[in-house]
Amino acid sequence: MNEYHVLVVEDDKEILDGIGIYLKNQGYTVYKAGNGKDGLSIIEQEEIHLAIVDIMMPVMDGITMVMKLRENHDFPVIFLSAKSEELDKITGLNIGADDYVTKPFTPMELLARVNSQLRRYSKY
């Protein structure tokens, strides 16, 4: 078991649950939210080491959520989105994400990116 806490913010319940199960099976503690507002609430209540955030969600989108969380937090953020245009990726990275994964994705790719970001983060 590792000690990392990962927040997954995704409005598609099937994707949310799938990522949650996969990360739990890899030893991560997983917190889940269906929109950015709920994600920010979890961040204020729990120690989070990395967030995987969908961009297009109801209530509060991922871009707004990451802009708000960057006001007080510096843990790694991976955007997860069906938006695959280069401009979308550049925007996501410029507002504070550390990585950008496009849907569809494989669980192995997402896990590799999570591990990579946490490895970098743990050095600081």
Question: Residues of each region from the PLM?
Answer:
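N-terminal/domain-start alpha-helical segments
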Residues: 1-122
